[in-house]
Design a protein with these regions (language model features):
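C-terminal motif of bacterial Sec signal peptides marking the signal peptidase cleavage site
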Residues: 14-16
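Sec-dependent signal peptide recognition
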Residues: 2-8
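Beta-strand-centric surfaces of beta-sandwich/beta-rich domains
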Residues: 19-201, 207-307
């Protein structure tokens, strides 16, 4: 998508920086799961107040067989938001870490992720996230520093595999977003309209905004009939733990090509500068039953792209 890795960097004057305090946090993630592995990332220092950064780290994990992932559990310092795993065939030296670029992200395929607060994200039933043989695992670690201090970001990710020999169906991902988001100082709103380009079987949907969010609504229009999934006054804890709506995998939400998804977001930007995508967001995420093993897709301001 055009700018899923967009960041809003609100730089403060260097004179002001001289009065800021550097804060260090303890970071002790639990050990790797018995049937899985752990990826620990190099810390990122000097994260400035009022900034959002997205880093990509190419790990030393290059798959020698296809992996079937059942769950991921992310761990980050308090400004982490979130930690996400991708894979790529365009390999870099292990440990390469830099702010993610559009060119980088265009070479990645989404594998899964976690909010980064130690909450395990598990796919239900016999669903798994598939990672092919012969690819390099890449971790995207996002840091949102809404404090008045210079901070260090640290991240780790535990990956739990499905039990071998069990029946498996691939889980997929959807996103509805506008990465050209720009929020002026004060109150603002945005509407996103997406028309489905293919049939999907959805088992989970959830909204996503950051701390300046006020309200979000998500509607689906199925066969011409509108159904409201969310109508929420936003709360601070929703940033990391949003409400979600789920359907049994035996009876998923059936979305047909031509159906629509409507997302409405409202904010109150109490800072003194406009915000762009990264510092704030307006997103609806969906998880699908992807037995056909098709590419994940996202609707970015009405334009469908693979990710």
């Amino acid at each position: 998508m055009r700018r899923l890795t967009a960041v809003a960097v609100l730089t403060l004057l260097s004179a002001a920086c001289s009065h800021m305090e550097m804060i260090e946090e303890e970071f002790s993630p639990p050990p790797a799961p018995e049937n899985g592995m752990q990826i620990q990332l190099k810390e990122v220092q000097g994260l400035q107040p009022g900034t959002s950064y997205e880093y990509c780290t190419w790990t030393d994990q290059i798959t020698t067989t296809e992996l079937s992932v059942k769950a991921m559990e992310g761990f980050q310092t308090k400004i982490g938001h979130p930690v996400t795993m991708f894979y790529t065939t365009k390999m870099q030296p292990p440990g390469t870490t830099r702010e993610c670029t559009e060119m980088d992200m265009a070479s990645f395929r989404f594998a899964g992720g976690s909010a980064g607060e130690g909450a395990e994200s598990v796919v239900p039933g016999n669903l798994v996230y598939k990672i092919p043989k012969g690819v390099q695992l890449v971790v995207n670690h996002h840091y949102l520093n809404a404090t008045q201090n210079v901070l260090t970001g640290k991240s780790a990710l535990n990956i739990r595999f499905a039990d071998p020999g069990t029946p498996q169906v691939t889980a997929g991902h959807l996103a509805y977003v506008n990465t050209e988001l720009r929020i002026p100082v004060g109150k603002a709103s945005m509407d996103i309209l997406c028309t489905m380009k293919r049939d999907e079987k959805v088992w989970r949907m959830l909204p996503h905004m950051h701390r300046w969010g006020q309200t979000t609504r998500i509607d689906v229009v199925l066969g011409g009939q509108s159904q409201r999934l969310f109508d929420l006054p936003w709360q601070d804890d929703f940033t990391f733990h949003p409400p979600e709506k789920t359907w049994p995998i035996e009876q998923p939400l059936l979305m047909k090509a031509g159906d629509q998804v409507k997302v409405h977001c409202e904010w109150d930007n109490t800072t003194d500068k406009p915000m762009t995508f990264g510092m704030e967001m307006c997103v609806a995420f969906g998880n699908t039953i992807n037995a056909e093993e098709r590419e994940n897709i996202a609707c970015d301001n009405g334009e469908w792209v693979e990710f």
